[in-house]
Amino acid sequence: MTDAPVSRLRNFCIIAHIDHGKSTLADRLLQDTGTVADRDMQAQFLDNMDLERERGITIKLQAARMQFKAADGELYTLNLIDTPGHVDFSYEVSRSLQACEGALLVVDASQGVEAQTLANVYLALGNDLEIIPVLNKIDLPGADAERISTEIEEIIGLDTSNAIHCSAKTGLGVPEILQAIVDRVPAPPDTTEEPLKALIFDSYYDPYRGVIVYFRVVSGRLRKKDKVLLMASKKTYELDEIGVMSPDQKQVDELHAGEVGYLAASIKAVADARVGDTITLASAPAEEPLPGYTEAKPMVFCGLFPTDADQYPDLRDALDKLKLSDAALKYEPETSSAMGFGFRCGFLGLLHMEIVQERLEREYDLDLIVTAPSVIYKVNMADGSTVMVDNPATLPEPQARESIEEPYVKMEIYAPNSFNGTLMELCQERRGTFIDMKYITTDRVTLQYELPLAEVVTDFFDQMKSRTKGYASMEYSLIGYRQNVLVRLDVLINGDKADPLTTIVHRDKAYGVGKGLVEKLKELIPRQQFKIPLQASIGSRIIASESISAMRKDVLAKCYGGDISRKKKLLKKQAKGKKRMKAMGKVDVPQEAFMAVLKLNENK
């Protein structure tokens, strides 16, 4: 299986925007090379999480090895490294690109170049990959190959004279793609005799064998039973098995430079075999690791609470297990007066947060309450120290702090130019600063803005999609922290502070957000037997208030006619009871109310 000389190895990946047909093309390549028998084939073969198939997106990286007989009669080994296309997983994309020498740039022939395609193309160019443009969905009635080719040339500057026209659905053009990979993607450098260095580009947790690590051998050889050292985590392991994915795992005895494979070594947690880490031999370690390893930093935080307090231990176990397979997830215990015990969790972005939440509910059968997402703020204290705050409820008091800085992102939005006005209005509303606007083609435009991440994480994406009828796509990257006049907005329900609803907002927007919040809560909280005041406050100053009127129980129903003093007595008794109820009563706040922060812009 591994006797392929380095000169006949090709490592490549597929770059595409969501829905441009990447997974379907991967399926077709596997089928055409006979890697997967036709009878075993199922759509999105490499996306093996249910959630991936359902959403039609790639979350975890997969890899597959194919044998292809080229035009020169030689048998070539092609390694396809699948990449996630979503902005949240861009670190994972950059690692898988590092494991390749070439990339197929798949563009939908009816849609054209989109934001995420571009971001990943620039990463690929930065890694010096040979890029082969492929125009997919050429069989669609709306396909316009000429226009899209010029678009690729103008935007990315790639020569599309030899772009391949294909339809991954029907299999048209797939043999040409395989031949182009052999002809145009360079073979890996032959560094088999140098010390072992292998790049980890993915890992997942297997309950029986521990962590399974996917890697690309950059130099040297790796044999079964070798003792290896992971350079970033400084841990050593003895290999239980090594092998290749075709796409099912097949064990081999040795892998040499340029090859892609997997290893199992009874590693306990994914955090010990971090993506981007370098594997080397414990007996003869390499002098320095491969460049580009960084720790995944969570950007978006939220509270996760079980709806039933008895499920707290189950939630903790579920998070511990998820952490084994998702090194980017961070969490710590948190208690809240309104919600009881739960966890404060950190995620790479909104999609990552949604996926973790869905996996917890689906795979571990939990019912969760999720608080509104927030970002991590940098608070400069009066005594000169700096505190990082990821939970708005823990923001230090105004007198103790000097200033607050919030993370900013640089955002690029690609859209048809008829939606220019509404998109600019949206960015303006979200405290965006206009940077640049370019016409890509006569009817498509790219807008560049800098805006606070906090304004992006709530519902920016949904708003952008609904304003542009789904035509716009966006891409953002962090550009650092900036100081702003920010305040903490608390919400009081019946005089009690509701921690999960606390937010940090810009002072100019505080009144609008506060008013919107209490109005939304008035709709969402059911009426009780007593009157419930809802207030939004900054410190001790109430800036907006509403109240939910009490349900009226007619205590006079039984008095037909009769003495007025009898009625007064009953009404007085009722008033006294309500007063006591108000002092003692607890308000049941439904889950929807905690997400009210997200829904503020819905009615606009």
UniProtKB/Swiss-Prot annotation:
The keyword Membrane applies. Its main location: membrane. Its EC number is 3.6.5.n1. CDD domains: EF4_II, EF4_III, LepA, lepA_C. GO terms for cellular component: plasma membrane. Keywords: Cell inner membrane, Cell membrane, GTP-binding, Hydrolase, Membrane, Nucleotide-binding, Protein biosynthesis. GO terms for molecular function: GTP binding; GTPase activity; ribosome binding. It comes from the Bacteria. It is a peripheral membrane protein. It catalyses: GTP + H2O = GDP + phosphate + H(+). GTP binds at D19, H20, G21, K22, S23, T24, N136, K137, I138, D139. It is found in: Cell inner membrane. InterPro entries: EF-4, EFG_III/V, EFG_V-like, EFTu-like_2, G_TR_CS, GUFP, LepA_C_sf, LepA_CTD. It is an enzyme of class 3 (hydrolase). Residues 7-190 form the tr-type G domain. One of its GO terms (biological process) is positive regulation of translation. Required for accurate and efficient protein synthesis under certain stress conditions. May act as a fidelity factor of the translation reaction, by catalyzing a one-codon backward translocation of tRNAs on improperly translocated ribosomes. Back-translocation proceeds from a post-translocation (POST) complex to a pre-translocation (PRE) complex, thus giving elongation factor G a second chance to translocate the tRNAs correctly. Binds to ribosomes in a GTP-dependent manner. NCBIfam families: lepA, small_GTP. PANTHER family: TRANSLATION FACTOR GUF1 HOMOLOG, CHLOROPLASTIC, TRANSLATION FACTOR GUF1-RELATED. Belongs to the TRAFAC class translation factor GTPase superfamily. Classic translation factor GTPase family. LepA subfamily. This is Elongation factor 4. It comes from Synechococcus sp. (strain RCC307). The gene is lepA.
